[in-house]
């Protein structure tokens, strides 16, 4: 993918920039940006800005490129990713690209509370403002909980409740921090709340063949998020046979810089053969995990995948927030996760939450 240095945008626009009579490079960039198969990564690398001690250019990490790959190539994706790892930013980036790339679509963003849902909408609006002006689809309606583009695509944000999809035919539903839905209730009530929401969105997605993206850090091993995650990482069919691998292309040894997905190695090789001779040698087919038994693709990323989070950072964060919080929020381990520990010279299995309580009592 050729790299461009594009001027940041100047805010919301009501009329599309006319590319006629301008340098042909602008039309070339437009075509690359809104290519249905490969445009999402181009958009992320060239057009997205985010707030991080000011407005900074979004530079997707390897796991974020994988997120974009999965969202663009699969109907259902569940992501177990640690705190402050950019999972929401990456999802919002994809949603903004999709909203401008495709016409007459409904997109629903949900989170465990209205405030969180509105915050995610504000991320999309900020990205739109700084997107290069000549790549923007004009916005004709803008309020706190909705955006309407001139191409007919509508984006809404709502709390994660069974009423959320009402009145919509969603092409995408994005559920952020899904494990925290019903978090102030008992474990059983939280599960019921999550199941009611899932039951409400399933018919709508089935009717539109829409996409479902779920991201979260973990809470427990009894909620619906955990069950969806467990089904997604189960790579065997109902007869307990291994599901066949999918294939992606590495380019110059880097995976996910190419965003094409293939279901057989033969298809991947055939695609490489269509490339110019000087390009063929740069590519190689790589086996990757398929969707799980429940039809969800999955991605896991803890703090170690972020090059900005060092051992020194971990040490400071452990002192600041404690072991249980760190394990759940950054290592993606819930309080229900069972770990093996040495107690009085004997190996024992213990829930992480119980271990933290025991350590706290010993230190008091």
Model-predicted segments: where are they?
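Phosphate/NTP-binding elements of NTP-utilizing enzymes
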Residues: 1-336, 341-344, 349-350, 358-364
């Amino acid at each position: 993918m050729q790299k461009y240095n594009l001027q940041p945008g100047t805010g919301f626009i009501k009329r599309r920039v006319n590319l006629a009579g301008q340098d042909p490079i602008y039309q070339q960039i437009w075509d690359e940006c809104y290519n249905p198969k490969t445009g999402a990564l181009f958009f992320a690398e060239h057009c997205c800005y985010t707030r991080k001690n000011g407005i900074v250019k979004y530079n997707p990490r390897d796991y974020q490129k994988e997120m974009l790959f999965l969202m663009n190539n699969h109907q259902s994706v569940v992501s177990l990713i640690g705190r402050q790892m950019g999972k929401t930013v990456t999802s919002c980036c994809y949603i903004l690209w999709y909203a401008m790339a495709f016409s007459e679509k409904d997109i629903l963003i949900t989170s465990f509370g209205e405030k969180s849902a509105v915050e995610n909408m504000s991320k999309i609006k900020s990205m739109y403002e700084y997107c290069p002006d000549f790549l923007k689809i004009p916005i004709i309606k803008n309020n706190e909980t909705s955006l309407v583009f001139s191409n007919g695509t509508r984006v809404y944000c709502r709390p994660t409740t069974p009423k959320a999809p009402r009145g919509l035919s969603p092409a995408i539903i994005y559920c952020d921090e899904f494990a925290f839905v019903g978090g102030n209730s008992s474990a059983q009530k939280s599960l019921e709340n999550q199941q009611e929401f899932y039951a409400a969105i399933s018919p709508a997605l089935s009717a539109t063949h829409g996409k479902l993206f779920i991201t979260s850090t973990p809470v427990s091993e009894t909620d619906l998020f955990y069950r969806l995650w467990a089904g997604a990482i189960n790579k065997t069919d109902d007869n307990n046979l291994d599901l066949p691998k999918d294939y992606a292309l590495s380019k110059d040894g880097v995976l996910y810089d190419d965003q094409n997905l293939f279901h057989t190695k033969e298809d991947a090789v055939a695609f490489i053969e269509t490339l110019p001779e000087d390009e063929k040698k740069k590519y190689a087919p790589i086996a990757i995990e398929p969707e799980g038994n429940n039809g969800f693709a999955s991605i896991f990323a803890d703090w170690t995948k972020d090059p900005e989070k060092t051992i020194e950072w971990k040490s400071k964060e452990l002192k600041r927030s404690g072991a249980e919080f760190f394990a759940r929020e950054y290592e993606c381990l819930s309080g229900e996760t069972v770990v093996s520990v040495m107690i009085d010279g004997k190996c024992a299995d213990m829930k992480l939450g119980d271990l933290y309580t025991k350590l706290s009592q010993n230190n008091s």
